[in-house]
Amino acid sequence: MIILINKPSDLKNINDNQELLTKSKITEELQVNPFGKYLLEVENNQIIGYLYYSDIYDRAEINQIEVAISNRNCGKASSLLEKMIKLVDKNITLEVKKTNTPAIHLYHKYNFEDQAIRKGYYQGIDGILMERKVRK
């Protein structure tokens, strides 16, 4: 089940996943970023994956997406990304390490296109700026 978290009180029935994400981390991010939202993939009240994004006026930006190691390669990241695309219905941008091949394939599958390269952005590793334009 995917749950949209807009404010800390939305977390009342969710348990922390110390290896992945805690409610205190979510609360902190939501207080610092007024545009921030979390999509949580939850099983048995436990967080098994999340997508943290900023919904900024005319666009949305994916800040982070992660799935617990034991739940990878099961379509969880795809489900989170699909849900976000439906929710925001606007252009979406992100940045990914050039070496993160699984993530790049996922983004290309959902029609994200490479826009620019940030040379050495991640401690010597290039970053790829990607964008998915709304198809209207």
Indicate residue ranges for each PLM-predicted region.
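Short acidic/glycine-enriched loop/turn segments that link adjacent beta-strands
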Residues: 35, 58, 100, 121-126
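Acetyl-CoA-dependent GNAT
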Residues: 2-70, 81-83, 87, 135
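Glycine-centered flexibility sites
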Residues: 49, 73-77, 116
